[in-house]
Amino acid sequence: MKIHLIRHNTTLEFNNETSLLDHLEKNNIHHEYQCRSGYCGSCRVKIKKGKVSYKEMPLAFIQPDEILLCCCHVESDIEIDL
């Protein structure tokens, strides 16, 4: 799958083997985080295209157009405001 980062103007390949947050860090793209488990909401970003899911609904409050990088499961190519 492909992850397009709008503000970085770059696209990364992604295979769900790690969290999206970990994958971004491995590619030297850093974003704020704290808990890494869906509790705090620090890693939320806007999703513009595509679909994600969660194994368990995160406790952090998110809007329908937001995802948590630390715990989302990418279901398709996505475009995020990052």
Swiss-Prot record:
Its cofactor is [2Fe-2S] cluster. GO terms for molecular function: 2 iron, 2 sulfur cluster binding; metal ion binding. Keywords: 2Fe-2S, Electron transport, Iron, Iron-sulfur, Metal-binding, Transport. Pfam families: Fer2. Binds 1 [2Fe-2S] cluster. The keyword Chloroplast does not apply. [2Fe-2S] cluster binds at residues 35, 40, 43, 72. Disulfide bonds: none annotated. The keyword Coiled coil does not apply. Residues 1-82 form the 2Fe-2S ferredoxin-type domain. NCBIfam families: PRK10713.1 (NF007985). This is Uncharacterized ferredoxin-like protein HI_1309. The lineage of its organism: Bacteria, Pseudomonadati, Pseudomonadota, Gammaproteobacteria, Pasteurellales.
